[in-house]
Amino acid sequence: AGKKRPWKCCDEAVCTRSIPPICTCMDEVFECPKTCKSCGPMGDPSRRICQDQYVGDPGPICRPWECCDKAICTRSNPPTCRCVDEVKKCAPTCKTCLPSRSRPSRRVCIDSYFGPVPPRCTPR
């Protein structure tokens, strides 16, 4: 396992329960970061995954929101998603945060994200 985390962010971290944890980021990407030593193929030939392990915190999430109740996603696997939730403040990972059309005091992150459907913010 490397001393420096080979990814900037990770949405699908798989970590051991040890302290500190040993983590692998299972995010599917078109190109692995330059810091990744072992970049392997996925089922889809256009996607790759960094197979490096890192000892410690897997780092921040990549998607532009932490959770989403109203996700609009493509049917691809993994999907491309947008979140149309109206929030008080967009997540720090959101690049384009605009006022809601229906409620200007609320905000909507209009970024698209390629990866797993985000978790819900409120339980069903």
From Swiss-Prot:
GO CC field: extracellular region
Sequence repeats: 1-62, 63-124
Disulfide bonds: C9-C62, C10-C25, C15-C23, C32-C39, C36-C50, C67-C121, C68-C83, C73-C81, C90-C97, C94-C109
InterPro entries for the chain: Bowman-Birk_prot_inh, Prot_inh_BBI
Keyword Disulfide bond: yes
Annotated GO MF terms: serine-type endopeptidase inhibitor activity
SUPFAM superfamilies noted in UniProt: Bowman-Birk inhibitor, BBI
Keywords of the record: Calcium, Disulfide bond, Protease inhibitor, Repeat, Serine protease inhibitor
Site feature (Reactive bond) residues: R17, S18, R75, S76
Family label: Belongs to the Bowman-Birk serine protease inhibitor family.
Entry function: This inhibitor interacts with two molecules of trypsin.
Protein name per UniProt: Bowman-Birk type trypsin inhibitor
